[in-house]
Amino acid sequence: MALISQLFQNYSFSSQERFLQYVQIDTQSDPLSNSSPTTEKQKNLGKVLVNELHALGISNAELDEHGYVYASLPSNVEHEVPGIFFCSHMDTSPDCSGANVKPIVHPNYQGHDMILPDDPQVVIRLAEHPDLVEQFGNDIITASGLTLLGADNKAGVAEIMDAVSFWTQHPEVPHGPITIVFTPDEEVGRGTDHINLAKIKAEFGYTLDGEKRGHLENETFSADYFRIDIQGVSQHPGFAKGRMESALKIASEIIESLPKDHCSPETTEEKEGFIHPTDMRGSVEEAQIEFILRAFETEKLIEYVSISLPKV
């Protein structure tokens, strides 16, 4: 530990520089796509990562047809050591634009309002985000106000790449076999659909996709997605009595019927699951509502649907 601490003192960390580069590469996934990856542009970041890994001397780094990046470092100790792997996802949420991201570094945060220049009405205030009190003195990175930043999970990608850089620069630091995996399509629930487990020679693994430094989670929820398609009956408004059936009104009634005090993200915590409408669109003639489901017990996923939407 003393050796590593000393090396860290002299090491030029690159995670911030890498992060600022990665977030400018659009990698939004698409829940409506049937391809794998759901968007080809996710491979653009994968190609960058493979090239950087090759430059670090990791010659086995590869990007497969489904958009997964695999790389491994051999053990550098003579005795047998359990393998470990580190994983992060490259895609960003489809809920907000990931194109033309302009990251902004706010240095030495002291509790002041952070105004995002491309939309001055978007202001990050300490009073509205009390967890920021723990970041006094740190640099904070935001988007410019019009896009997603993409810290979920390009922060994890940058951290892993920085760690690989450290290991390759300091082979005197002992370690067992290490596998690196970067995945596509996590944001749309397909991050492991085509993962090649044969390439992961590890007995333990960590996904770097959490919260603040020092926070460790040892379990996660089950997840699912579903969509309700509503077919209405369109008529000229002047002759609609007894004929028109508005798909939009039906969709609104479905949303209104959802629980107000439970089974929703804004009313749950810890291991409480939820059903959450993420998108609604349509017209009088037809409408769609998209939902995500989360539960720590897989069998409860369908239970939340039957409880929340008994008439659908």
Feature-to-residue mapping (PLM):
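A non-catalytic alpha/beta surface segment that caps or lines the substrate-entry region
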Residues: N34-V81, F85-C87, D91
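Active-site metal-coordination/substrate-binding segment of hydrolases
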Residues: E80-P174, F182
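N-terminal capping segment at the start of a domain
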Residues: A2-Q6, S12-E40, I141-T142
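Midchain, well-structured core segments that form catalytic/ion-binding scaffolds
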Residues: N138-A151, H170, D185-I307
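Short amphipathic alpha-helices in soluble, non-transmembrane regions
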Residues: F86, E303-V312
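A common structural junction motif
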Residues: M90-D91, K260, L309-V312
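Predominant activation on well-ordered alpha-helical scaffold segments within soluble catalytic domains
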Residues: Q16, L20, K47-V50, V157-S165, ...
